[in-house]
Amino acid sequence: MSAISWLEQHAPGFSGLSATERGLLTDFALLWSLFEGEVLKAAASVNTIEQTVQRWNQAGLLLPQTFAAAADYFKGRYFAEGVFTYRFDHLHLDRSGNPQVVRNVLSGQDAAPESIASALLIIVYRYRCNLFHGEKWEYQLQEQEQNFSHANEVLMRAVEFNRRVQQNVQGLSE
């Protein structure tokens, strides 16, 4: 029996997910693994994310529009009408040191490209924690399509940025 067939029979809500939703979840698992291994050197944390973003910023890669679509989506999901939404608490930022940068970016208090990149990657990191530690199963993976679509875009861009920085470093040492 394939894992998908087994999940359809045994995982609450899995059989109700569309092929697109299932694909996005699979893509996320693979992209996160690549990102954490290649970019964060198998040491994912808020600190390593922020250090990585600083390298990108120093290399001149971060512009205001770099992560604009994802930033707009996450702002709309987690901050509306001047307050953080009920979904914001489900990120469980307290489990990752409660980084203020996420609040500042989502509320519009900080629009610096490096802050936006850090905040988005921290949100994606929390998606990883919530998915792989089981919290997302509490609500049967419902309403996750856009979350993982944007998270995947952020991860792909992050891997590309990291490779550019690595190429620049290699070019300087030759």
What residues fall within each predicted segment?
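Charged/polar positions within long, soluble alpha-helices
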Residues: 40, 44, 129-136, 159-167
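Repeat-unit-sized solenoid/scaffold elements
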Residues: 107-109, 113-119, 162-170
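A generic "alpha-helical surface" signal
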Residues: 26, 115, 119-122, 146-149, ...
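Histidine-centered, metal-coordinating catalytic motifs and their short helical/loop contexts
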Residues: 117-138
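Amphipathic, Lys/Arg-enriched alpha-helical patches that create a basic surface
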Residues: 146-174
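Short conserved catalytic/interaction loops centered on acidic-Pro-aromatic/His motifs
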Residues: 138-145
